[in-house]
A protein has these predicted regions:
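Short active-site-adjacent helix-start/loop capping segments
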Residues: 19-21, 42-43
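Alpha-helical segment that forms one wall of the substrate-binding/catalytic cleft
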Residues: 37, 41-118, 122-130, 172, ...
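Catalytic and substrate-binding regions of cell-wall glycan-acting enzymes that process beta-1,4-linked
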Residues: 113-166
């Protein structure tokens, strides 16, 4: 997929502590890479057939509201359970990161870093592009002002000790450090 294996190791360590059965208490996120249901269905629909998951990809449809659906409940459970299979989850995480990498590079006109990719995982692709463009223009801008919903849900990221709001550069640096530490803790080098 062209995505650095060390990045994927770091992401899995940060997201789940390398636990294939990890589940978020605040969302539908599950597995090594903590895919939420809609993100998982999207990446499986787009790339599943390339990796022997044609049966899954062809069972994922899109409703009039734009949400991805699987009409058969047992098939839906089987597709979502794949988030807990380390090989499948890693392949789909790599494909998802590769898609994000291409889009970020096209949008910013530079090579995407591992931290850029992690921002896309955290904020979604549109949010990451918005974050990165704003950070390049004004690194001292307060992150919570730009992403109020994300800040409410992730106060430890957007605010420091005593509720002090963090700048875009500070948030980015925290993610960079977190990703580097996660990768190093599982033996990855050179992020």
């Amino acid at each position: 997929t062209g995505v650095d294996f060390n990045y994927l190791l770091g992401q899995a360590q940060v997201e789940s502590g390398m636990r294939t059965d990890a589940r978020a208490s605040t969302s539908s996120a599950s597995g090594l890479y903590q895919f939420i249901e809609q993100s998982w269905l999207a990446v499986v629909k787009k790339h599943g057939a390339e990796h022997g998951l044609g049966w899954a990809a062809e069972n994922i449809g899109q409703g009039a509201n734009g949400r991805l659906t699987v009409s058969d409940p047992s098939t839906r459970r089987a597709i979502l359970a794949l988030r807990n299979d380390p090989a499948t989850a890693s392949l789909m995480a790599a494909e998802h990161a590769a898609d994000n990498k291409t889009s970020i590079e096209n949008s910013l006109g530079r090579t995407a870093t591992g931290t850029d990719l992690y921002m896309a995982h955290f904020l979604g692709l549109g949010g990451a592009r918005n974050f990165l463009k704003n950070m390049e223009a004004n690194p001292g801008k307060i992150g919570a002002a730009l992403f109020p919903a994300a800040a409410r849900a992730n106060q430890n990221i957007f605010y420091g000790a005593g509720g002090q709001p963090r700048t875009l550069a500070e948030i980015y640096d925290r993610f960079s450090t977190k990703l580097d530490r996660g990768a190093a803790s599982v033996g990855a080098v050179g992020l």
